[in-house]
């Protein structure tokens, strides 16, 4: 389903970009994705119900999502027609990846053993920007006592580990190789 979601997301992204509605489409799709998470079983039931016609599934989309951007609604109708309305969250995640790549931004999780100050976060964000060539970093912080000291940053699939725990693990590996 991930490939299918990527295709829908790419088509919607291209239309939104061409019509200069990228931010509006992103916001609507994000809202719909988050709200649909609570109703995933019902959406799967709609997808798998053989007695529902394509028109009935389209009417459902129109009634529930009628205030969304027309391009989002049309995408949802196509999803419903093809019995894929339940993958709307995956479509959003794929759309979000395209959106973040376009704006050269990404999410970062900064883990440390204590709550970081705004100044410390700003310095880490600047380091992330230099390492990743991102122009914008959306930060979530997390306290992780297992790190012992220092910090660990996760951006996408990349991990930058400056923790004391990582240093100790690396040191232990060197000792093991030496023996």
Curated annotation (Swiss-Prot):
A molecular-function term among this protein's GO annotations: proton-transporting ATP synthase activity, rotational mechanism
Chief location bin: membrane
Residues in coiled coil: none
Domain of life: Bacteria
GO terms for cellular component: plasma membrane; proton-transporting ATP synthase complex
Cited InterPro entries: ATP_synth_OSCP/delta_N_sf, ATPase_OSCP/d_CS, ATPase_OSCP/dsu
Entry annotated with the keyword Magnesium: no
Protein keywords: ATP synthesis, Cell membrane, CF(1), Hydrogen ion transport, Ion transport, Membrane, Transport
Subcellular location: Cell membrane
Membrane topology term: Peripheral membrane protein
Family to which the UniProt record says this protein belongs: Belongs to the ATPase delta chain family.
Job description of the protein: F(1)F(0) ATP synthase produces ATP from ADP in the presence of a proton or sodium gradient. F-type ATPases consist of two structural domains, F(1) containing the extramembraneous catalytic core and F(0) containing the membrane proton channel, linked together by a central stalk and a peripheral stalk. During catalysis, ATP synthesis in the catalytic domain of F(1) is coupled via a rotary mechanism of the central stalk subunits to proton translocation. This protein is part of the stalk that links CF(0) to CF(1). It either transmits conformational changes from CF(0) to CF(1) or is implicated in proton conduction.
HAMAP family linked: ATP_synth_delta_bact (MF_01416)
Subunit note: F-type ATPases have 2 components, F(1) - the catalytic core - and F(0) - the membrane proton channel. F(1) has five subunits: alpha(3), beta(3), gamma(1), delta(1), epsilon(1). F(0) has three main subunits: a(1), b(2) and c(10-14). The alpha and beta chains form an alternating ring which encloses part of the gamma chain. F(1) is attached to F(0) by a central stalk formed by the gamma and epsilon chains, while a peripheral stalk is formed by the delta and b chains.
The name this protein goes by in its record: ATP synthase subunit delta
Species, as recorded: Staphylococcus epidermidis (strain ATCC 35984 / DSM 28319 / BCRC 17069 / CCUG 31568 / BM 3577 / RP62A)
